[in-house]
Amino acid sequence: HLCDRRQRQMCIRDSPIFSTEATAKLCGIMLPDSAHIQEQDAEYQNRKNERAGKPLVEPLYTAQDAENSLRLFKGVRYDSIIQICPGVEARFTDVGHLLGSAAIEVWVTVGGKKTRIVFSGDIGRDDRPIIKDPESPEGADYLVLESTYGDRLHTVSTDDEKEQEFAEILREGIARGGNIVIPAFAVGRTQELLYYIKRFLVNGTVPGLEKVPVYID
């Protein structure tokens, strides 16, 4: 991650940004929205800094930065081999983490020798309701692997068990006449929650759910 705004501007000034097609489309929505939040946060912090006599801060990136970067995006289909520059080729493979996520296979040719490097990115799980199962690139000379959880193991539970647990939470909340607040990532998790809520409504799994308004921020 580049933390200095000037460094980021230098990196993206004229360079193409290769991504999956879905990622490019999502960024058209998410980057301007995130930039607006960055500008608001900086404005709020600067009001406090002015009162305290502290230096002003700049937003991590602005709406103009976002607009400039979006012009550089090049959406690429999964499994298509593209040339990044002479001697460097790449391919995106669907890893089932969220819409547009990918592992990146990179082939680098130096002195007639081709080396294959695989960057895993965040890897999803099998049997997700709205995302394809992850695919595994075959073979690599070097593998750069995500390790979000280190050496910890996930608690093993089936999707059916998780769905029933979610349904039970909703049933309890409705029975108490209370509100249920669910923090969730805007991309991926929120859509999955909506999928399950729709299933509950169609199947009648959660009595009274049809009378409950659902709001998404």
Question: What residues fall within each predicted segment?
Answer:
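Core dinuclear metal-dependent hydrolase active-site scaffold
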Residues: 67-132
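Acidic/polar short surface loop at catalytic or gating sites that assists cofactor/ion binding
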Residues: 28-72
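Cap/insert and terminal regions of metallo-dependent hydrolase folds
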Residues: 103, 124-216
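Short, well-ordered beta-to-alpha junction loops that form the rim of enzyme active sites
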Residues: 2, 22, 184-187
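Hydrophobic or amphipathic alpha-helical targeting/insertion segments
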Residues: 13-35
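Active-site flanking residues adjacent to catalytic metal/cofactor-binding acidic residues
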Residues: 3, 20, 121, 145
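Single conserved hydrophobic/aromatic residue that forms the stacking wall/gate
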Residues: 1-8, 12
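Short internal beta-strands
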Residues: 16-24, 47, 144, 210-217
